[in-house]
Amino acid sequence: PFFIILGWQIINDIKKLKRTIMITLLSVYMIFTIITFPITLPVFSPSFINDYMQSIGFKFKLEKGKEGYVPQLIADRLDWRQFAQKAIKLYNDLPEHEKSRAAIYVVNYGQAGAIELYSNYSVPVISSFNNYWIWSKQKLENVETLMAYGEDKDDFEKAFSEVIDSGVKNQTEFGYQGNRTFYICRNAKFNLKKIWDNEKNFR
């Protein structure tokens, strides 16, 4: 009987210890969630997030090494509509005869997806990033004009004889991919579809 009682007591003590550990871990998790909630989900204004980060002493670095106004996981979710609307307007402002043989080129799938979403998939978008590289190849068949974004002018001049600054700039204080210019590129120096294999950018 003694060993039965002792064993029962040990089992009860283990259950209490496990319960205490679970309660402690849950409490730590809840506290951590409450603290990090404003800086992990885009539900507050950027100014609030920035003030909150400073009040708790948090600092974040952007992928390009710059210290951001807000954390990059927030910054990368902002201003997509504004970016897409600028690209769409630039495309729609082309003459009708040119528009039918034009497309928008961007460097990553986030930009490409935003343009497709906010244009209701009415604007042809080309990107070499991930699956868009596959989807874009067929679109290159008849493209003569590109509204290009995400690289410097001299990069586009390697592929096009005429590269014009459109005067449209994606100005944003959030994220590292903003503050670049849209260029209108015409007169390709070679068949774009033939060089597309070299542009593959899978990550």
Question: Could you say what each language-model-derived stretch is?
Answer:
Residues 1-5, 26-28:
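Hydrophobic membrane-spanning alpha-helices of multi-pass integral membrane proteins
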Residues 3-15:
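Transmembrane alpha-helical segments
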Residues 12-53:
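Signature aromatic-anchored transmembrane alpha helix within multi-pass, membrane-resident enzymes
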Residues 13, 114-117, 151:
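Short basic/hydrophobic patches in alpha-helices and adjacent helix-turn junctions
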Residues 37-42, 46, 51-133:
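Short periplasmic/luminal acceptor-recognition loop of GT-C membrane glycosyltransferases, typified by
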Residues 82-86, 91-95, 120-203:
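Aromatic/acidic, Gly/Pro-rich catalytic loop(s) in extracytoplasmic/lumenal soluble domains
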